[in-house]
């Protein structure tokens, strides 16, 4: 069976709260690590989330 075009990733909060979002990304269009501002409900602020592996 062929490998899919999208990888599942985990967006980990840079506020060190342990909160994360799971999403997927297209390997071909975004080969680098993703970073985005998202809401962290633990600190109740928008913080930078960085891509990490799903274990």
From Swiss-Prot:
Family: Belongs to the bacterial ribosomal protein bL33 family.
Stored SUPFAM superfamilies: Zn-binding ribosomal proteins
Matches recorded under Gene3D superfamilies: Ribosomal protein L33
Swiss-Prot/TrEMBL keywords: Ribonucleoprotein, Ribosomal protein
InterPro entries given in the database record: Ribosomal_bL33, Ribosomal_bL33_CS, Ribosomal_bL33_sf, Ribosomal_zn-bd
Transmembrane segments: none
Protein name as catalogued: Large ribosomal subunit protein bL33
One MF annotation (Gene Ontology) recorded for this entry: structural constituent of ribosome
GO cellular component, one term: cytosolic large ribosomal subunit
PANTHER family: 54S RIBOSOMAL PROTEIN L39, MITOCHONDRIAL, LARGE RIBOSOMAL SUBUNIT PROTEIN BL33M
Biological process terms in GO annotation: translation
